[in-house]
Amino acid sequence: EAIDAHRRAIQLDDQSFVARWALGGALTMSGRFEEAVSVLETAARMSERHVLALVGLAIVFGRWGKRSEASALHRELMDRASRGYVSATHLALTAEAADQHEEAMAFARRAWDERDPAFILWGRHFPPYRALHSDPRFAAILREMDSPGVHS
């Protein structure tokens, strides 16, 4: 159903980066990795390699077991972060996709410490974070997120 809705959004606006990014995510979560890569590569091209497109590609490659491709995307974002801002939330996701668990945990901690809105939104329920949920350090972050007065 989500895939059909995103395809319809692309039909309505074939220049929509967001519609392609969302379709790529839906295809990834459905296990349709080849299609997801194709859609997300198009999104990356049309957006001049927007961070979200690269994160989406890293996630699909990680889920597909193509760790070297995920690692290359993580390195690209790390290089970009050395020259400008890339959120710790996005770096945590690409590190985990590249099977760099310790680095992913460090970025997740930094994302929470910085109160990165994307982490607050995605940290608990976004499927690519599930691999981190079993780590006691990530569980501690989630408990901190639930602490009274944290969001006031």
What are these regions (language model features)?
Residues 1-152:
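Alpha-helical protein-protein interaction modules
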